[in-house]
Amino acid sequence: MMKTTYSLGEAIEIGIDEAGRGCFWGPICAGAVIWPPEEEWTEEYREVTPQIKDSKKLSEKKRVAVESAIKALAIDWGIGLVDASEIDENGMTWANQEAFRRAIAACSSGLEPDLLLIDGVLGLPMGDVKYECIPGGDGLYLPIAAASILAKVGRDRWVTEWVNSSDKHKEVAARYDLLNNKGYGTAKHRDGLKAHGAHGMHRGQFIRNWL
């Protein structure tokens, strides 16, 4: 079973993770989750918690179901998006950190975190708030795993809703197989770039070798 907290005591810890960092197209998305300590769990928490895992280890259907439970049970949660134009203008490190900031800002409870638990090696200076970078944290700490699910499902949902919002968007998606690859650089996506060139929501720095 994953750990629910990093430190002892009553520190407010927020788990943070991202999805879409390596995509060719579309935004990077971050999730942020504050999960209650184990001593506060009801039976409902005990049923849901074993299902919260690194998002990559869950099927799409399972991720969506668990995402709903996380949103219902978390003390607080938020999602932050940074689009492709911002990534091209400011670079991926900035974009990744900005997605983290936006996810934290989207939390609505008003609680001020004492500690950020961040998956990976990229820190996030935020004044007096401490942070811990934890490689593989989405497989070790429950709040990070929950954040990884929110980020993955949130980004996939954003792509699907964008595609289905107009016939023009559906035509764009068909060129690059976006509904299936969600913007990642699959073989079909690369073939689409060679055949049609770039779309306005492609990340220029990511695709230059495929044009």
Give each language-model segment a name.
Residues 1-211:
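RNase H-like, Mg2+-dependent phosphodiesterase core
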